[in-house]
Amino acid sequence: MGSNKFDKNDRFFFSPAVGASWIISNESFMKEVKAVNFLKLKASFGVLGYTGNTGFFLYQTGWNNNGNYNFFQDQTDHKVSLARWGNPDLTWEYSQEFNIGIEGLFFNNRLSTELNYFHECRKDIIGVNNAQYAATAGNYTMYENIGQVTNQGIDIAINWKGNIGRDFLYTVGANMTYSKNKLDKWNEIEGVESYRKAIGRPTSTIFGLQALGLFGKDIPLEDHSLQSYGIYQNGDIAYADLNNNGIVDDNDRMSQGQSFPVTTWGINVD
């Protein structure tokens, strides 16, 4: 694989893959099992590079044109400012993918089933490592290979083909996918409170403030930590000051669940 999104030393990526299968139904010990028409065990492993989320020329330092300025009355020159530091060591995101499964046909090919287990480790995900630099650094940051995500799960499909009379044919089936992922590495600040950590949680984790109740009804207004989100009064929601610093702000956000469903189901009728 090749891409001009990287420096000349990293423009090519070796992407090997291998797969194997065993058709169990072809074995002699299966010949007498009339209910099984086809049965196959399969497995594969591959390494795949990604450039879809990578911008062009991130390996080069970029500059902005800020117009002109005059000096010595009649002399003009251009003004430029730093837009982004380039990173010549930036390289491909890639995934290591492993799959193993079994598929079969039964009862004169009327019943078809398939079960697969998948495991993917996505490495060297590209992002801005702003946790390494102070906020006052401005644009003096660069894109780096800083992330890693693990995805794994199973998917199952089952279908039945039948007929009513000679002319009415039908197929009914169901499928299910169970999938979980976890952020293994990212540019997270060292020493951050455990409730704020993104590492170790699903990538679709939603962070938000923890509601304690209503001011005036559940929580005394005058005894609560200062909430930094505008004016509030009795009847408004009181939020938890999780780090106990006397101020409720973004540093008190905690995991509220995730937006991506772990299990999905489907039914088909033809």
Q: Where are the predicted features?
A:
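Transmembrane beta-strands of outer-membrane beta-barrel pores
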Residues: M1-N4, I24, F45-G49, Y117-K123, ...
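Extracytoplasmic loops and strand-loop junctions of Gram-negative outer membrane beta-barrel proteins
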Residues: G2-N4, I23-E27, V80-G86, T136-M142, ...
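Outer-membrane beta-barrel strand-turn architecture
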Residues: F14, I24-S28, A35, G49, ...
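Transmembrane beta-barrel domains of outer membrane proteins
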Residues: G19-I23, T91, G101-L105, N116, ...
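Solvent-exposed loop/turn elements at secondary-structure boundaries
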Residues: K31-E93, S112-V149, E193
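Transmembrane beta-strands of outer-membrane beta-barrel proteins
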Residues: N37-A43, I100, L111-T113, Y170-V172, ...
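Outer-membrane beta-barrel signature, preferentially recognizing the C-terminal barrel domain
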Residues: N68-S112, T141-G165, G200-I206, Q258-T263
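Conserved small-residue
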Residues: E144, T150, K161-S259
